[in-house]
Amino acid sequence: MGSFGMDWNQKSSVLWDWENMPPIGNSANENPKNVMLAESKLAGVGVDIGHESGHSSGGTFSSSSEIGYGSSKSSISASIDSPSKVGNTIELNFASAEEHDKNMDKGKSKVDDTGTSRSPVVAANRVEPLIGLKLGKRTYFEDVCGGQNVKSSPSGVSVATPSPGLAKKVKVAQQNTQNPHCQVEGCNVDLSSAKPYHRKHRVCEPHSKTLKVIVAGLERRFCQQCSRFHGLAEFDQKKRSCRRRLHDHNARRRKPQPEAISLSSSRLSTLLYGDARQQASFLFGQAPYGQMGSCASSWDNPVPGGFKFTATKAPWSRPTIAAGVDGTHVSNQQASGNVLPHGAHHSFDGLMAFKETNAKVLNQGMEASAVASGSARGPDFEHALSLLSIDSVGAANLQPGSQIHPGVTAIAGTSNPVMMPSPAIWQGGLSLDQQAQFQAFDRLGNDDDEDHLQLPKPSYDNSHYDQMN
């Protein structure tokens, strides 16, 4: 061990250069040799080096098993004391690892848990652990080192500043502790026993429904949707909510109404009857409504007794049909699209007047088939008025009980009848047996015998048309 002490003395002069060291004392002119006094103490297990030198004042030293200590690990701890001497004394204590760990555990305290700054604080004689107050990410300790903590209060423990939300709750709680009164001028009603709604908004129940009140010198009205006082201009007369809130309320709850379709009477009649009238006009190839047009039959001849057809279109009225021979004039009211042969009268009840004689033809079914039975059967009216081609089939449709004068011969096989177009609306109409067929007859010779107009009898009864009279 003596050799170890000699080596230490030789190395200490090399390791330490007292002339080049900065001043440590209170004055920069002091000599560090006179100020600083180094003492080297080696602590071992029953081993005392016993060598003390003024030059062995410090250095880098790591103890090993050569010292006689069984552990191969040791550390250096430096403590700076401020005695009543003139200078500072640096004391090197070489202790075991266990003693060092105990001292460090007692002397250190963490200031911040975030790990950004850690400064060991040496507490020499303090054993009890520190109690910290953790608020969020920071921990506040008691002021141990005299104002070195991050935040502290005069009492030693830092107090966090209350948040605005907490302050608002405290304010509301203080207001609730006081007895609320109605804020309307002249009304000092205590609302402590009123409903929570009125206590919260500080308005009594009568004034919450009053049309006009005075609040802070202004005319106001309480809105039950906004729960506030508004100006009178924002309200309707009898509504308890302001106009803006009512509009929003109705827009959320009411569905948009479909646009109403308004039709005048003239427009409605045009929609209902316009198509039927146009179809009747197309059926006979006539001019527009209210005009007259004439068309000669295909057997036009200079004979005075020939037929001459005039097509007319008149408003819907009580239908009649007329037929004439030898130019006898007939005045007649007829439905749209009727063919008016200038001749004898034939009323709706079956009377037909001829030039030579008056024959009563009881064939109302045929007449009704030639006219419209109503607005619903307007297209069927054209079915009855069409002049179909009369051939052998048409001649076979003659009733066997018909009365034909011997001097009258059917001209179906000798003359070409008037042909009318068959529109597409006939597709869903009556059959050929039920359709109206006009068969025109001409006189043979110049005798004065009676002429008869043969009208085929329809296959349906006349009860429907009798009701129209």
From Swiss-Prot:
Q: Does the keyword Transport apply?
A: no
Q: What does this protein do?
A: Trans-acting factor that binds specifically to the consensus nucleotide sequence 5'-TNCGTACAA-3'. May be involved in panicle development.
List the SBP-type ZnF regions, as residue ranges: 179-256
Q: Report if keyword Ubl conjugation is assigned.
A: no
Q: What is this protein called?
A: Squamosa promoter-binding-like protein 3
Locus of motif Bipartite nuclear localization signal: 239-255
Residue ranges annotated as compositionally biased, kind Basic and acidic residues, are 97-115
Query: What's noted about domains in the record?
Result: The SBP-type zinc finger is required for the binding to DNA.
Disordered: region residues? 96-118, 446-469
Entry's Gene Ontology molecular function annotations? DNA binding; zinc ion binding
Q: Which organism is it from?
A: Oryza sativa subsp. indica (Rice)
**Residue spans with biased composition (Polar residues)?**
460-469
User: What InterPro entries does the entry give?
Assistant: SBP-like (IPR044817), SBP_dom (IPR004333), SBP_sf (IPR036893)
Keywords of the record: DNA-binding, Metal-binding, Nucleus, Transcription, Transcription regulation, Zinc, Zinc-finger
* List of residues binding Zn(2+) 2: C223, C226, H230, C242
Subcellular location(s) per record: Nucleus
- Residue sites binding Zn(2+) 1 per the record: C182, C187, C204, H207
Q: In which tissues is it expressed?
A: Ubiquitous.
Q: Name one GO cellular component term.
A: nucleus
